[in-house]
Amino acid sequence: MYLYIILICRLHSFNLPLKLIFNDPTFSSLLLRTIAETYYKGADVGECLATAYRIKEGDFESWYDEWIKTAKRIHNYAKACISGGHLKSANEAFLRASNYYRTAGFLLIEPADPRFHASIELSKECFRNAISTFTFKVESVEIPYEGTILPGYFYHLEIQNTTYKNMERTGDPDQKGSDKCNRKLDIPSSNNFPTLIVHGGFDSILEELYSYGAAPALERGYNCLTFEGPGQGEVIRKQKIPFRYDWEKVVTPVFDFMASKSKEFNIDLERVVLMGISMGGYLAARAAAFEPRISACVLYDGVYDGYDAIKSGLPKFLVDAIEAGNSQFVNATFTDLMKSDPNVKFNMKHGMWTTGTNSPYELITGAKKYSTKDILNYIKCPTLVLEGEKDDSFPGQPKKVYEGLTSLEPSSKKYIVFTQEEGGEEHCQCGVPAITNQRIFDWLDEILGNKS
């Protein structure tokens, strides 16, 4: 979750390995993140590039304006496809519109901005319409959690009827409260399947996890559960529940839910994998240290210590002020930066909102809790640690995570570095989903004995 704090602390010393159209590192990385969903039909390269070239460099309002135009246009395509009965085309257009709506609202500075919430709701609406035309069964789930619920999607390996004869054509893309676009299912298999549980990190939403987890899992013979926890997506937007460092308190209820649904969902409880993406690499490691039912863990990427990462990107005078407890000076410094730099303003406001903190100083010092230093030896399940060669969010930390897995035999842990030559040097290997998924799932297949 502290990824972007680290980025802003390096605003004047950026040396990112890739600049895509934009010189602004935030715009470049977010564009790549959006384009990366092309692999699973969540984007089209030409649409993304045409949108990007219309955006004014470093202008957050221009970013929103141009992406929302593209999203609305593709959304209208999807509606027309539904009206004409072109359901495959509608599926693809809804997926792209969902991604573009998410991208449009991403950089809106004020969390209370109604455009932010509207863009996310439209992203979710388009995704719901897309999954109604998938050839496999997907259902929304509600995971009981401390008197409330965590939202999720369960993607069944079980295949739906692959013809569209059971779908009633309608011109209305909003299927809320309607079963008109749900196909009848084939008779469920009696087999139980390995299942991948995926959560994001600092800024992803539930629907984005389809491309980054569910789609490759289904292709390789895995069920998949994606969910949002405290500080993420709807849980922070609607329930106002901030991040928590003790993520096992989140994952244990998820495993309880899985156990309660194991027969209905054809889940092999002896083969359940947890994967955390981006800052989720910290969260998943924390959960794996304390939840014994995790069969294997994927840290995508590894995070050793959030506070150390922040300090490594700050000038000495500011580190000294933080460690001396000079909150007034620290807050004043960041307040000045927020007035002059929209990147700083966005990241600080988003960080304080999702963590429930009230000042930059409180946000930064709160990162001390987000450390795996003293818990890695508690992890007993096979663990895969990923790293981008030139990812400067947590430089050198994934290797420390791997080396800290002292309770695991060499055969039960693996550390993979994605190189610039491969195109995978960016944070979370953004832009190379093919090789990333190949390495993740080949390792999981070997660990779990799955044949994909």
Where are the predicted features?
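Catalytic histidine neighborhood in serine/cysteine hydrolases
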Residues: 405-424
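N-terminal cap/lid segment of alpha/beta-hydrolase-fold proteins
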Residues: 67, 121-187
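Primarily recognizes the serine-hydrolase "nucleophile elbow" in alpha/beta-hydrolase
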Residues: 102, 269-317
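Short beta-strand/loop motif that positions the catalytic acidic residue
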Residues: 379, 385-387
